[in-house]
């Protein structure tokens, strides 16, 4: 049997072949389970803008996005990035899913979120997302954990250095470079509290770009992990017991929050978030109740709380922000498996105001509609 490393080496010589002027465009979309899917299309030339990219389609009955008797779902390009795998002029295309009647597919939450971002563009809302995830081997065991046993308790792994303290750094470094090559605004990485758990940060990004960049960063992570024979889990509590869960802490600021005296705007935003806690929690990721227990650096899912430098609160205000009197806040409630369009959308809706033609709670509920 050929090893994964050998397969990659074999592939390399074919990637050096001429494409005779053609460009490969990998179309990426989000399926019914919140996973990324993709397929490739040949273009005659490199596009200069997203408007140059053709609409495409796929079999939605095979992804849980359409019934078999009416299975065509259409892919509308919304952004494209340099392809770090094929390199050259090849690209990765992020798309929205649309039904054949011209309506957004019920798992396309970008469309609704974009309405809110556009309506509140003057607020200049910035986001930064901290994506945590856990690595597993091909047999669904935590990557590099002792066979049939457990590693030492949590403590030495967070931002750890050295054998036995960090695992799969090569994969993480490869993903970091892939994001930078693609043009994703990745701002950092670190090993997390549980062994074989990592985090990358994307942002700050303004408006709808935040969701776009996180989805592409996730896609790139899954693709890189393929080459290492490693599985990536975004489950918020992949292992029961005395192990940290995985979140997607959401850092938020508006223009007024970033100006001197902005703490007043932050306090107003927190009071609005407190009033919609239950609604937000429904959009903050499946199985999040397993993570938000009030332990392992989380708040309880049952109520809203906030505090300065408090990682056991629903929302944390960094100490530097409290000292300077302006900046941003960190919503620690979102789970690692969120749809960032839902989370950033309801955040803007809550702190900036609702608009007549967009409702993120109803948008989320569309997933359960017939």
Curated annotation (Swiss-Prot):
Domain GS catalytic: 109-370
Keyword check for Cytoplasm: yes
Keywords, in A-Z order: ATP-binding, Cytoplasm, Ligase, Nucleotide-binding
Location of the GS beta-grasp domain: 23-102
Top-rank taxon: Eukaryota
Recorded catalytic activity of this chain's protein: L-glutamate + NH4(+) + ATP = L-glutamine + ADP + phosphate + H(+)
InterPro entries: Gln_synt_N, Gln_synt_N_sf, Gln_synth/guanido_kin_cat_dom, Gln_synth_cat_dom, Gln_synth_gly_rich_site, Gln_synth_N_conserv_site, Glutamine_Synthetase
Compartment annotation: Cytoplasm
Documented EC number(s): 6.3.1.2
One cellular component term from this protein's GO annotations in UniProt: cytoplasm
Record GO biological process: glutamine biosynthetic process
Region (Disordered): 40-69
GO molecular function per UniProt: ATP binding; glutamine synthetase activity
SUPFAM superfamilies: Glutamine synthetase, N-terminal domain (SSF54368), Glutamine synthetase/guanido kinase (SSF55931)
Subunit-structure text: Homooctamer.
Family, as annotated: Belongs to the glutamine synthetase family.
Protein's name in the database: Glutamine synthetase
Organism: Debaryomyces hansenii (strain ATCC 36239 / CBS 767 / BCRC 21394 / JCM 1990 / NBRC 0083 / IGC 2968) (Yeast)
Record gene name: GLN1
């Amino acid at each position: 049997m050929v090893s994964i490393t050998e397969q990659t080496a074999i592939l390399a010589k074919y990637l050096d072949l001429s494409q005779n002027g053609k460009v490969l465009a990998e179309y990426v979309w989000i399926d019914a389970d919140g996973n990324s899917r993709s397929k490739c299309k040949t273009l005659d030339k490199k596009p200069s803008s997203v408007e140059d990219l053709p609409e495409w389609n796929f079999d939605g009955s095979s992804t849980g996005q359409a019934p078999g008797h009416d299975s065509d779902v259409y892919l509308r390009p919304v952004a494209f990035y340099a392809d770090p795998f094929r390199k050259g002029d090849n690209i990765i295309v992020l798309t929205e899913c649309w039904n054949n009647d011209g309506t957004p597919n019920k798992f396309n939450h970008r469309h609704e979120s974009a309405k809110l971002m556009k309506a509140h563009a003057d607020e200049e809302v910035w986001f930064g997302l901290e994506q945590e995830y856990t690595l597993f081997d091909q047999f669904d065991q935590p990557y590099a954990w002792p066979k049939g046993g457990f590693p030492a308790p949590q403590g030495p792994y967070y931002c750890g250095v050295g054998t036995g303290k960090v695992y799969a750094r090569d994969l993480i470094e490869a993903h970091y470079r892939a994001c930078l090559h693609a043009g994703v605004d990745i701002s950092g990485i670190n090993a997390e509290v549980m062994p074989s758990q990592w985090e990358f940060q994307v942002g700050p990004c303004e408006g709808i770009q935040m969701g776009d960049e996180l989805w592409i960063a996730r896609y790139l992570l899954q693709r890189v992990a393929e080459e290492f024979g490693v599985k990536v889990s975004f489950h918020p509590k992949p292992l029961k017991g005395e192990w940290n869960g995985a979140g997607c802490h959401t850092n938020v600021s508006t223009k007024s929050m970033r100006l001197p005296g902005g703490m007043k705007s932050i306090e107003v935003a927190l009071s609005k978030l407190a009033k919609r806690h239950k609604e937000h929690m429904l959009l903050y990721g499946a199985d999040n109740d397993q993570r938000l227990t009030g332990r392992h650096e989380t708040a309880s899912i049952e109520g809203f709380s906030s505090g300065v430098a408090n990682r056991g609160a629903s929302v944390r205000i960094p100490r530097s922000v409290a000292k300077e009197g302006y900046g941003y806040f960190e919503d620690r409630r979102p789970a690692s498996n969120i749809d960032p369009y839902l989370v950033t959308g309801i955040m803007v809706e809550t702190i900036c105001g609702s608009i007549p033609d967009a409702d993120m709670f109803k948008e989320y509920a569309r997933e359960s509609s017939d």
